[in-house]
Amino acid sequence: LCIRYNNDIYKIVEFLHVKPGKGPAFVRTKLKSMTNGKVIDNTFSAGHKIEDVRVETRKYQSLYNDGETYHFMNTDDYNQISIEEKFLDNPQLMKEGEVVTVITNSETNLPLSVEMPPSVILEVVSTEPGVKGNTATNATKPATLETGAVVNVPLFINEGDKIKVDTVKGNYKERHKE
């Protein structure tokens, strides 16, 4: 859900309705600006009116990036758009050809944000060999993925393995079984 607040468009990332024992109810929110990517915490009173913003979602395919800008192609009409890196969550996990959802403002038709799938499958290109030692807990080691991202993986993961990575948190989920 996107809202207009303080002359900016925000995406509601988190919200919590609070009804204290004393006093009126309120809603705590975490809002992400769609223009500059900053996340703010805000509290709305129960009677506060909010203007929602109409948005459209379309599927786009990632083509390439040239530093700070990522280029995408609409999978329906093949139109291409360019989006700055600050509008992407975990862009280091996106590989060329990845299909993503681009959210655009219905009124201005400008892109607001890019949503990746919940998880992606990437190949480990370099990691140290795992040595079983005196580990009482789940030991991890850093691994560099095909996109250049570095994530911590369990000791049993080796170079060449494909792993599933959570795109929201940017961490290892499981080994991919082909």
Give the label of every model feature segment.
Residues 1-178:
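Acidic-enriched and Gly/Ser
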